[in-house]
């Protein structure tokens, strides 16, 4: 069994040992603090059916907590919108912010287990960067994660995954994610 004090996630160790040096050489950084690294990963689940049944938000939060490995926060409406039948403070979805070891563990599971299980998967879009080194992607089915028991799921939910890096440009961020074996299609 692994000792908690000495355990390091696989991708974190890979970053320290090989990726950091490769990025420093590729972009010619003079200082180690200039090298881009992962800052956080935000998982967001907007549950459209929450307007009719608020229990679905709780169920979505439980499933997101299983996927992330930490408790999900329920997000609420900031203001009322009559056209969508939304009232202020009404629960609409849930989110989780991952940092540290859990972030690296989630990214490892996403790249190596979840994405290959997506139907008709041909790689993630290489153009989904925001101009400041952050990458956003969506999944239509949360059941691709091994933590979710398909038999106990009432409804298949989609989710947004935002990978925030300290990179200043999209090219730096793409190079960082490619080093982590993110399967870009372009």
UniProtKB/Swiss-Prot annotation:
Keyword vocabulary terms for this entry: Ribonucleoprotein, Ribosomal protein, RNA-binding, rRNA-binding, tRNA-binding
UniProt keyword tRNA-binding present: yes
Pfam families: Ribosomal_L5, Ribosomal_L5_C
GO cellular component: ribonucleoprotein complex; ribosome
Any single GO BP term: translation
Keyword match Cell membrane: no
Gene Ontology terms for molecular function: rRNA binding; structural constituent of ribosome; tRNA binding
InterPro entries: Ribosomal_uL5, Ribosomal_uL5_bac-type, Ribosomal_uL5_C, Ribosomal_uL5_CS, Ribosomal_uL5_dom_sf, Ribosomal_uL5_N
Record-stated family: Belongs to the universal ribosomal protein uL5 family.
Function (record text): This is one of the proteins that bind and probably mediate the attachment of the 5S RNA into the large ribosomal subunit, where it forms part of the central protuberance. In the 70S ribosome it contacts protein S13 of the 30S subunit (bridge B1b), connecting the 2 subunits; this bridge is implicated in subunit movement. Contacts the P site tRNA; the 5S rRNA and some of its associated proteins might help stabilize positioning of ribosome-bound tRNAs.
Subunit structure: Part of the 50S ribosomal subunit; part of the 5S rRNA/L5/L18/L25 subcomplex. Contacts the 5S rRNA and the P site tRNA. Forms a bridge to the 30S subunit in the 70S ribosome.
Protein name (database record): Large ribosomal subunit protein uL5
Species name: Paracoccus denitrificans (strain Pd 1222)
Gene: rplE
